Regions:
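Conserved acidic/glycine
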Residues: 1-53, 247-249, 253-359
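Cofactor-binding active-site loop characterized by glycine-rich and histidine/acidic residues
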Residues: 29-32, 39-169, 187-193, 198, ...
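Gly-rich Lys/Arg/Thr-decorated short loops/hinges at beta-loop-alpha junctions or inter-strand turns
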Residues: 36-39, 107-115, 141-145, 176-182, ...
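Short, ordered loop/turn segments at secondary-structure junctions
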Residues: 72, 178-181, 213-214, 242-244
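Short gly/pro/ser/thr-enriched loop/turn and capping motifs at secondary-structure boundaries
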Residues: 75, 181-184, 218, 245-247
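Conserved thiamine diphosphate
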Residues: 137-141, 193-225, 268-295
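Long, amphipathic alpha-helical stalk/connector segments used for oligomerization, subunit docking
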Residues: 228-235
Length: 359
């Protein structure tokens, strides 16, 4: 993959990427503050320091493309266009949240936006995205599915199973490994045999590339190239975006941070938001006044989202019970006949097809 020079980013795209990064940073800073006050329920995993990845990826996607996320998923949902008020309400455990307050931070989904959901199960985004990509290919819709996951998830069996199937069937997929260096408290260097996760793509004969995950433009251009391959029927791409989470594993973390201070400080100096801001200024895409206006506007958006969430009601017990099962569908079982002779395997297959059609 070396055709990134074929793509030129217009000023409006650069501003869109930066604005999205600003939204994510403001949302996460506010989430952190409200968690400490006990307003955010459960736990949450901050995306601060990794904003360039979600913004660079999702601004390259078409509206109909799919994404699936993981426990550190606020940024992905925001970048794909999720409603900030409903997201905040979900974190508050309120009825107007995406899951009516029952899912919390790790389970935000919006099927209208093809956000298949964040997920508390490590690596679960990959099979969900693989299924979405298979459906898109069978329907011939030209949609692409993106799976976001961390470096720790690349050591799960489902990583290899998903890459293998996607490669065999040449599914329109992009696997985005957000390598923030640590799976909870364990460095990926102590758990991963290869130097880079992207090297594992070779086993499935698909492109694998390691990029600077703090450079939103590099992320965006790399994804544009992967999208071009996917829509052309050439199959999936594995992108490893090297980055760093600024805080501990979660906002509720009560473990000693094992990361060396010198290492943390060096990554903090590589602030992806500041890098993008400097790019806009140096290329005269935006002035300092424009930057401030974007910052003020995004802060106001988050303020409004908090206000919406605070006004939302707590879910009642009926919601808890009614949300457990899917709506029941009555259907009449086909009557039995005795005018055909079927083998056991044929009868079993026919019954399965009937049940699948009724599901």
């Amino acid at each position: 993959m070396n055709n990134k020079s074929n793509f030129k980013l217009e000023p409006d795209v650069l501003l869109q990427i930066y604005t999205t990064m600003r939204q994510i940073r403001a949302f996460e800073n506010t989430t952190d503050e409200l968690f400490k006050k006990g307003i955010v329920k459960g736990t949450a995993h901050s995306y601060i320091g990794e904003e360039a990845i979600a913004s660079g990826v999702c601004t390259a996607l078409d509206e109909g493309d799919y994404i699936a996320s993981y426990h550190r998923g606020h940024g992905h949902c925001i970048a794909k266009g999720a409603d900030l008020g409903r997201m905040m309400a979900e974190l508050f455990g309120r009825k107007d949240g995406y899951c009516q307050g029952l899912g919390g931070s790790m389970h935000i989904a919006d099927m209208d936006l093809n956000i298949l959901g964040a997920n508390g199960i490590v690596g679960a985004a990959m099979p969900l995205s693989t299924g979405a990509a298979l459906a898109a290919k069978l329907r011939g819709t030209n949609q692409v599915a993106v799976a976001f996951f961390g470096d720790g998830a690349s050591n799960q069996g489902i990583f290899h199973e998903s890459l293998n199937l996607a490669a065999v069937w040449k599914l329109p997929m992009i696997f985005v490994c957000e390598n923030n260096q640590y799976a909870l408290t364990t460095s990926y260097r102590n758990t991963t045999a290869v130097a880079q996760v992207a090297q594992r793509a070779a086993a499935y004969d698909i492109p694998g590339i390691t990029i600077d995950g703090n450079d939103a433009v590099e992320v965006h251009l790399t994804v544009l190239e992967a999208l071009e391959r996917a829509r052309a029927g050439e199959g999936p791409t594995l992108i490893e975006a090297m980055t760093y989470r600024w805080g501990q594993h979660s906002l509720r973390a009560n473990l000693q941070d094992p990361r060396p201070k010198k290492e943390v400080d060096s990554w903090l100096e590589r602030d992806p938001l500041k890098q993008m801001e400097n790019r806009l200024l140096s290329k005269k895409v935006a002035s300092k006044k424009d930057i401030k206006a974007i910052s003020d506007a995004t802060n106001k958006e988050i303020e409004n989202a908090v206000g919406f969430a605070l006004k939302s009601k707590e879910p009642d017990m009926a919601v808890m019970l009614n949300s457990v099962y899917a709506p029941h569908k009555d259907h009449i079982e086909p009557g039995s006949t005795c005018n055909r002779t079927l083998s056991f395997v044929e009868a079993l297959n026919e019954a399965l097809h009937q049940e699948m059609a009724l599901d």
